[in-house]
């Protein structure tokens, strides 16, 4: 005979599982020691336990397995096959229902994103020229590179002296003639202050801007820029102008992945 420990090892399950099966009458030992309470099983019981565990891996409830056993279907290949076919059909219906639910969730999220973008209001401001000191990136595909630039810059931002407002940082973006862009993560700095090693000073020209407030995560900023240039400006009778646009980060920015973060997007216009 096999001990409960041997049977547990054969099937790589816990003895607690076997004790539970015994307690509910699903799989009982052939003999239980009267003096020590040890459970012993016959080798012939291995096949039945194998079927029980196979059904559990298929997410069949213990109650259903118990009914199969009591009805004799657990040891009847034909009846077990019919049960599994019904279980397969049920799973497919559940998966189909979940897929419909997931599709509805996708539509809801898309609607919320559309609502978030459609409700961006614009205000018109004119700003004089100002200087930004920070770290720069040249490239053609922003992707994760902008985030990586900020990750390198933030640990060094304390090196910048003469900040106009230490609570406000800028993400400056200037398009280059070759199609690439020049991005600077930095702070507005008064003239005359030194530029730390590895950083640059960028002069932002005086300009008229349409200012939209982006609400959402940092990766979603690209979606807001796309909406602004594709239709939001035109819907408001505004015409974009080639120049320097920038992101304005103040205390409303709670972190790059916080959906409640707010960032002002300054778009140069005529």
Swiss-Prot record:
Annotated positions binding 3',3'-c-di-GMP 1: 1, 31, 34-35, 40, 270
Binding-site residues, 3',3'-c-di-GMP 3: 67, 70, 86
Binding site for 3',3'-c-di-GMP 2: 1, 31, 35, 40
Protein's UniProt keywords contain DNA damage: no
An individual GO BP term: regulation of DNA-templated transcription
Residue ranges constituting the HTH merR-type domain according to the UniProt record: 1-71
PANTHER family registered for this protein in UniProt: MERR FAMILY REGULATORY PROTEIN (PTHR30204:SF97), REDOX-CYCLING DRUG-SENSING TRANSCRIPTIONAL ACTIVATOR SOXR (PTHR30204)
Name the record gives this protein: Transcriptional regulator BrlR
Native organism: Pseudomonas aeruginosa (strain ATCC 15692 / DSM 22644 / CIP 104116 / JCM 14847 / LMG 12228 / 1C / PRS 101 / PAO1)
